[in-house]
UniProtKB/Swiss-Prot annotation:
Belongs to the DEAD box helicase family. DDX3/DED1 subfamily. Residues 430-590 form the Helicase C-terminal domain. Residues 17-27, 42-51, 66-75 have a biased composition (Low complexity). This is ATP-dependent RNA helicase DED1. CDD domains: DEADc_DDX3_DDX4, SF2_C_DEAD. GO terms for cellular component: cytoplasmic stress granule; spliceosomal complex. The keyword tRNA processing does not apply. Its EC number is 3.6.4.13. A motif (Q motif) lies at residues 198-226. The gene is DED1. It is found in: Cytoplasm.
Amino acid sequence: MADQLNGDMGNLSLGSPQPGQHPGQQPTARSYIPPHMRGKMSAPGSPGSPIASPPMNSPPQPGPGSSPMGGLNNSAWAGNNNFDARAGGGGNWSGGYENGPGPQPWGGPRGGGGFNRNAYRGPNAGGGGGGNMGGGVGRGEGRWIEGKHVIGNSDPRLERDLFGTADDPSKQHTGINFEKYDDIPVNPSGRDVPEPVLTFSNPPLDAHLLSNIELARYQIPTPVQKYSIPIVINGRDLMACAQTGSGKTGGFLFPIMHQSFTQGPSPIPAQSGGGYRQRKAYPTALILAPTRELVSQIYEEARKFAYRSWVRPCVVYGGADIGSQLRQMERGCDLLVATPGRLVDLIERGRISLCNIKYLVLDEADRMLDMGFEPQIRRIVQGEDMPTTGQRQTLMFSATFPRDIQMLAQDFLNDYVFLSVGRVGSTSENITQKVEYVEDVDKRSVLLDILHTHAGGLTLIFVETKRMADSLSDFLINQNFPATSIHGDRTQRERERALELFRNGKCPILVATAVAARGLDIPNVTHVINYDLPTDVDDYVHRIGRTGRAGNTGIATAFFNRGNRGIVRELLDLLKEANQEVPAFLETIARESSFGGGGGRGRGGGGRGRGGRGGNTDFRKYGGGGGGFGGGGGGFGGGQHGSGGGGGFGGGGGYGGAPQSGGYGGGYSGGYGGGYGNPGGAGGQSWW
């Protein structure tokens, strides 16, 4: 017995397959896989099988069995098969080796280090260490050599992954209906505003960027892109307001990529401390956004337009494995997309320096500043080593820019151009808006009627609470509707999985809280249902903006009852502004609220971002906004020399103007202590 046991033990080896493991497959530890590293197929004939790592300091082994992903499994739930990025220095095999056609350049001044078999198409796909001027070259990547942009070889597999095919439902192909946007008003303001461009052409855009734009099937620039491209190329700061789905992401990515392709990388500064310099990232462009989903989406767009170029995009956000994000940055980080919290964390760890930043972008800037991100933003912009205002370009993009946010933005912008495109802070006429009067107890039955009637396409349902999101999705599943949900209590992996199922149509109904409301570009959403209306009409605008994107059409249905009367006036104005049908019950409740004093955030004619002079107007041009004739408070006050916004009829006081003209609490109301709504009427309450 002992002899048999010894014999069995002698036959075991580290390479022996484990129970349930295919022969030749490496043992793996399950770990989080970010969305940009998922769905990558291994080589034909060996699905899911990782390729054994070549020995240290030896060239990679090209051949039919190699995998461009270093063996990452094609399952969204699979482990990240022995991802062992080595940042070490040392060996003599400094360059990468491309097993495609043609000779490949060897390692540059920052090459060196161990062979990294799992480098994700980074600049050191062949060698460790690295930055954007040295190391190896992965497939689909270019380089900057001696002042010239060397375009990389094509990679059909990566190209298909990035751009899809013409009939791929998971990829959005824009440029279809933008000809209809030619009559949309565009209002630039500022000193010496450059003339807009009318087409994607060279000049002004780099020829390689144009080829990537063509691969993405963009045909003509959107209104915001027509103006933002020449404004940024001419070195100006920009504050851009444009309706949701109007191409804001391209509005900042196109000119930044163009400048990067023509000017090349900034030199790495001399650093004391020796051997850790290669482990710190020195991006030249920083894009900040408020949510994990939005930064992932911007990153995927950046990958498209950086294809075959020297620019290496990276993404960092909370809720994901920080180790994999650090390894990605070590392989080159020229354009960084980040959430503020994770970026501050990495700065504190000494892994990111902002001293080379040429371009700072704040996407969904109003939400980041208005909802509590201001301290983190100010620390990143003003408290670290980022170049000061005037030494960098700062771009702010969003669908709404209320006047108080514009005033805060002055600290980040220098001699900027304010760009208002279309009905900013409003909704697109491409969206057909319907408002139905539905009591809370009837919402489920009415929802079922709508889903039966509007079968087909993707339907996004917004609710107010996490509990309701799970409850409603379970109810729909029990009614034989393929549904899933997304909210803040679900893990990052669960949220990304739910979004993927929704995007590819396997679960065409998504129930969501506000976590998915802003910025997410989900193609082919044909119907948005506000099961629970938000208390802020700006949130309503962003919710329904998930459909009707990129010039296409969509339907937005809202369930309204008297519990939502706090936004009735603004909702009414919104419908009229977008030439939508206004139901009679909405007019009736609006009149009741005007004279009966319903509480809530009634913001009148001079209100925040809507009506007369609001969030789509450059506040530098005008003074104070007056109060509205409604139950809500008065409008926001004006600029430095404007008068404070007075209270509306029956309403409490509005915000005042700038400190020079009375500060918050200008007008008659006496500041924040004024009524929030109508203190004397039904439903009114003090702000405090």
